[in-house]
Amino acid sequence: MDVDSRMTTESDSDSDAAAQGGGGGGFGSETSSASPSAPGTPTAMGAGGGAAPIAAAAIAAAASAAVVAGPRPAPGYTVVNAAMEKKEDGPGCRCGHTLTAVPAVGEEGAPGYVGPRLILFGGATALEGNSATPPSSAGSAGIRLAGATADVHCYDVSSNKWSRLTPVGEPPSPRAAHVATAVGTMVVIQGGIGPAGLSAEDLHVLDLTQQRPRWHRVVVQGPGPGPRYGHVMALVGQRFLLTIGGNDGKRPLADVWALDTAAKPYEWRKLEPEGEGPPPCMYATASARSDGLLLLCGGRDANSVPLASAYGLAKHRDGRWEWAIAPGVSPSPRYQHAAVFVNARLHVSGGALGGGRMVEDSSSVAVLDTAAGVWCDTKSVVTTPRTGRYSADAAGGDASVELTRRCRHAAAAVGDMIYVYGGLRGGVLLDDLLVAEDLAAAETTNAANQAAAIAAASDIQAGREPGRYAYNDEQTGQPATITSPDGAVVLGTPVAAPVNGDMYTDISPENAVIQGQRRMSKGVDYLVEASAAEAEAISATLAAVKARQVNGEAEHSPDREQSPDATPSVKQNASLIKPDYALSNNSTPPPGVRLHHRAVVVAAETGGALGGMVRQLSIDQFENEGRRVIYGTPESATAARKLLDRQMSINSVPKKVIASLLKPRGWKPPVRRQFFLDCNEIADLCDSAERIFSSEPSVLQLKAPIKIFGDLHGQFGDLMRLFDEYGAPSTAGDIAYIDYLFLGDYVDRGQHSLETITLLLALKVEYPLNVHLIRGNHEAADINALFGFRIECIERMGERDGIWTWHRMNRLFNWLPLAALIEKKIICMHGGIGRSINHVEQIENLQRPITMEAGSVVLMDLLWSDPTENDSVEGLRPNARGPGLVTFGPDRVMEFCNNNDLQLIVRAHECVMDGFERFAQGHLITLFSATNYCGTANNAGAILVLGRDLVVVPKLIHPLPPAITSPETSPEHHLEDTWMQELNANRPPTPTRGRPQAANNDRGSLAWI
């Protein structure tokens, strides 16, 4: 193999005719020339669908922000005086190394917490020839490969301290000009060149999850990119490792290789991207934006000419990858530079031009602002390439840019801070650590939110055309908590602190709404009809479960749906040993969890003197505890994940959804029923949420304070009312100091299932540690095919798009966690414990993704069972929902709490008239958050607010009277209302608890249990 024993420091043969700045235009597949836009006219970056695939309004918003305020220039750097215990802890002088940011491990303040770190690996520590003289040609001094290292150094950002790591395991060989990227808390190393020539193509992983770091060599099947150096690598979409270009010892390359980290066995796949990509080159940089867009910047081509253009690479939903030229005019060509994203801004530093020359002065630091579609240097927006050098003493000159005049250095970002280490300047190796802060990061985020909101409105009005795709059916696979001294959880004493409007308290009798005297409306007769359709839907699934049990299949090893990218949740060892602490069957909840003696209620009136009034009612006024309403299970006809054209915009889908829908006070039902997201965006949102859900356990471990929500069933207006009255999950609301837990049944029955589920998923992606979702019985294809969600998807998105969306959502539902433990004292689930669940470990052992028909009786009981009519009915009884389902008595509740050292079960699943209902002497609470369920129940909706002191406060809203004029009176809405009414008439919910049951429901028979 023709490999030099050294790498020249700059260009092997230079040319003064450096490539000029990259062209403008939209960031899409139709951009094929480098002609710039009019000077100062920014364009936003998207991908995969033409010059301007994202909404024009969003582009205009970004451009407007750029014109009014102007994108911030590139920041200046300062030297960091880092500490180290001994000299060898510091990396020292070196170049050709890598610097990789690794996120924090654990919760800050908790034992074992490790803050964000920078991991420096390898590089060369010496030069060939006379290091005092800068090299000028191919025959002059270069990196001395005998001085290449395999050292690992760690910079702790929080403590500002360097240390040298000594990992166990088999380390990579010494090397420089290699690549590295982070995959979670692991650093992946590949390629490079060392004393023995080109390094092998093996992937080496430095695992930092344990206290003692460890090297692993990843086993990869089949052919790969082969040995090379001067190439680039990045993790795209938190999934695909992409390796591009470099030099194989003979020539520069332009090939693209991908490794799917979610598919085992691992294998490299050579990609053939469409569109105009970069020429064969080496010493470029590649950085991945958070939404999955990769930007390749600069480099040196086969003629040793430095390149100026930047290229974006994106993956379409149909599996295609596509190159597109980034907009804007680069201030300078460069190679052997460093680049890293901070939000939507790509920070580029240093670089060489060849012939001993480096990028200097204002152009030595540059930013590609992908929100505005422009390049900036330290002076201003760049409209023409900088051909000359700024004088250090000229007006506005900044001598600090001399710090960044270097090449062969490395950069990484932690939050809004950009770090640069080492490199080469004038033939001298550097050992300094630099830092800069991107002050524009917050502004970019705000601009993105604003643009997203405008884009959402534009989409609704214009009706965006979905991307190309096809589908087919395929079976796929926190803060410290203050508790009471004895550590117990408590159901109620002092009044919890008011939230938002709660300070307007009115407890006068004339304003109180007495729940026990509520009159039965016409809807009662309608609700009394047994829901035969729901019984049929669930009975088939239950029969399949029983058949498997008869055939001897283990309940704790349910069949799971599998997909190429499915990662099963970890199965924990079951321990069915009872804890020492036990509750007696006749006990009341011990000091610990307490139900507050007053519930907070919002007046039902929409206006007038009582409009929006909040008052508190005694819990004793909610004594009618036998009034629940019911409804409907699943064959999982899920579609294979199809890859649709994706728009690469910094206005990420979650931000767009939140900006469009999270309007607690101002949301109104859309006049047009067409949903504002297309399939591309639905797929993006589901992909992001699925990555989070798949990493969570089946039983979440949560901390107080927390708000708990019951069934929502597509009643998005009620969700907004609850957010308006009792706080919303946003930075302007209370997300910073209280978590949110939703107990399932997000879709079906109501008219806005799409709004409900997409907002909750967006909130989960935006606040993954603060917003928690578990699965309900309607999060299953068999059920939501019958009770509204499927027909809503088709009605609002068209048949093809709607069916695809319905399939994709149901595939996501199979990943949802199944229960949540709060402070190890309260367990939250959707249905109940039924006949089979005696220990929490049984739920923990359910592996996901899981479908209802592949699940066990444990899953059926968890999602479908109910408490008996009242505390006097013990044991197990048939359930009116359908054959094979059960209700469980207060003795089962007490036994379960005894077995698991728990004090309270919070569950949803049943429409209770007051929004919440106590059972088993207060050891179980049923929670329902949608009001006037199915338009007939006239029930209140409620949430539970659990404080740090473990006091539970119910907070209620009542049904609103119908508005006199609203968008709902439009002809389009009349059609929508007709199909929803017909659906509910054909598939009525189960009657309220305590009301007359259908004659054919033999609730006394135990023969089939």
UniProtKB/Swiss-Prot annotation:
Residue intervals passing through the bilayer: none
GO biological process annotation, one example: brassinosteroid mediated signaling pathway
Gene Ontology CC terms: nucleus
Cofactor note: Binds 2 manganese ions per subunit.
Compositionally biased region (Low complexity): 29-45
Catalysis performed (reactions): O-phospho-L-seryl-[protein] + H2O = L-seryl-[protein] + phosphate; O-phospho-L-threonyl-[protein] + H2O = L-threonyl-[protein] + phosphate
Superkingdom: Eukaryota
Residues that bind Mn(2+) 1: 711, 713, 745
Keywords: Hydrolase, Kelch repeat, Manganese, Metal-binding, Nucleus, Protein phosphatase, Repeat
Region (Disordered): 1-48, 549-572, 984-1009
Cofactor names: Mn(2+)
Compartments in which it is found: Nucleus
UniProt feature, compositional bias: Basic and acidic residues: 553-563
SMART domains in alphabetical order: PP2Ac
Annotated Kelch repeat ranges: 136-182, 240-288, 293-344, 349-396, 417-463
Binding site for Mn(2+) 2: 745, 777, 830, 909
Family per record: Belongs to the PPP phosphatase family. BSU subfamily.
Protein name: Serine/threonine-protein phosphatase BSL2 homolog
Organism of origin: Oryza sativa subsp. japonica
Lineage: Eukaryota, Viridiplantae, Streptophyta, Embryophyta, Tracheophyta
Gene: BSL2
